[in-house]
Amino acid sequence: YNVDARRVYVAGLSAGGAMAAIMGATYPDLYAAVGIHSGLPYASARDMASALAAMRGHRTAAATPLPSVPTIVFHGDRDTTVHHRNGEYGIAGAELRSETGEAGGRAFTRTVHQGRSSLEHWLLHGAGHAWSGGDAAGSYTDPAGPDATREMLRFFAIA
């Protein structure tokens, strides 16, 4: 296959989102951008006990480093599996600007790194532990809300 090595992306939901964060942080020369939906940020846990604490919203690492590759994060504020604070921890320390809106019948707050478009955080109001804008026939998908797939593809195109 003739793959453009400059246009390789990784994305995932929940543990897959955490793995996407790890892959982007560990191999920044391989991935052009990362998409995380309802997952833990890089370096938020070091073992099972700290992972479970992080999933409950407790910050277990002294500081989560800002992503070194462009990263877009989605998280529902009613997620009872992985607390939504994890999405915020993944961009803590960045200078941010926020906007609110509604898509697919669900309100959201979108936060973008000030001065560059390499970090985006979407807090989905009323959403749980499911892929936003997904097909109702799927598992861990929520047809309500912004289309996370479409927004990740938009973000990847400008990353």
Show the residue positions of the predicted features.
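A conserved short beta-strand
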Residues: L30-S44
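Soluble non-cytosolic domains of exported or imported proteins
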Residues: S14, A25, T81-R85, D142-D147
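The feature captures the conserved acid-bearing segment of alpha/beta-hydrolase catalytic domains
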Residues: P41-S117, L123-G128
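Loop/turn elements at helix/coil->beta-strand transitions in domains of secreted/extracellular proteins
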Residues: D4-V8, D29-A33, L66-T71, S117-E120
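Gly/Ser-rich "nucleophile elbow"/oxyanion-hole loop immediately N-terminal to the catalytic nucleophile
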Residues: Y1-A18, A25-Y31
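Acidic/histidine-rich helix-loop elements
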Residues: D47-M55, S132-A144
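Catalytic active-site module of serine/aspartate enzymes centered on a nucleophile-bearing elbow/loop
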Residues: S139-A159
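Short beta-strand immediately N-terminal to the catalytic nucleophile in serine-hydrolase-like folds
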Residues: V10-G12, H37, F74
